[in-house]
């Protein structure tokens, strides 16, 4: 599967995936997602109309997944993903993991599912713009000291989800399904759909 979408003439979203069904061994998958932003002119407090220099930004996620039916009613899946964010000369990267389970009951094909997404270490931006020359006291002429700036680490948007679904009715050419899920993100409000 491959898709490419352009949003608002500035953002480009690309996604590609491949799944291999290994029969009783489960299913293996590879995925690639990318968000790119067109170059934009850099502005500053003193040059609000632009400096003449430009920057771009890009997010990338490359994942490997495995899923398997452990019994005729219980399924599990796991994804390991490398994530990288790039803004101008700085970038941050790290590993994230997703895990999910699904259990199906015989009553109206009731399915109970749970997942945890983006479990991983904090990320931190680093790059060439972090190296600066520092003057300890602007009132006295000093030799500029090479200095390295450091950004704060930030957490990945960890997400827990729980859901249930079941058949309302089944007919030869139609099926009614009702579903409910609850989502608990670490960086936003909980919600129920």
Q: Which stretches of residues belong to each language-model region?
A:
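Outer-membrane beta-barrel porins/channels
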Residues: 1, 5, 10-193
């Amino acid at each position: 599967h491959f898709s490419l979408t352009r949003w608002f003439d500035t953002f480009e979203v690309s996604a590609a995936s491949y799944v291999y069904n290994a029969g009783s061994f489960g299913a293996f998958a590879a995925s690639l997602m990318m968000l790119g932003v067109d170059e934009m002119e850099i502005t500053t407090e003193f040059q609000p109309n632009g400096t003449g220099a430009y920057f771009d930004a890009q997010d990338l996620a490359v994942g490997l997944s495995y899923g398997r039916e452990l019994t005729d009613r219980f399924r599990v899946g796991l994804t390991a993903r490398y994530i990288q964010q790039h803004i101008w000369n700085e970038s941050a990267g790290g590993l994230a993991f997703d895990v999910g389970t699904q259990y199906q009951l015989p009553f109206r094909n009731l399915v109970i599912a749970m997942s945890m997404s983006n479990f991983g270490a904090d990320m931190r931006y680093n790059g060439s713009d972090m190296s600066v020359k520092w003057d300890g006291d602007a009132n006295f002429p000093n030799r500029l000291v090479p200095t390295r700036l450091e950004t704060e680490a930030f957490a990945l948007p960890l997400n827990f989800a729980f859901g249930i679904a079941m058949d309302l009715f089944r007919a030869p050419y139609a099926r009614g399904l009702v579903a409910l899920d609850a989502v608990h993100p670490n960086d936003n409000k909980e919600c129920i759909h």
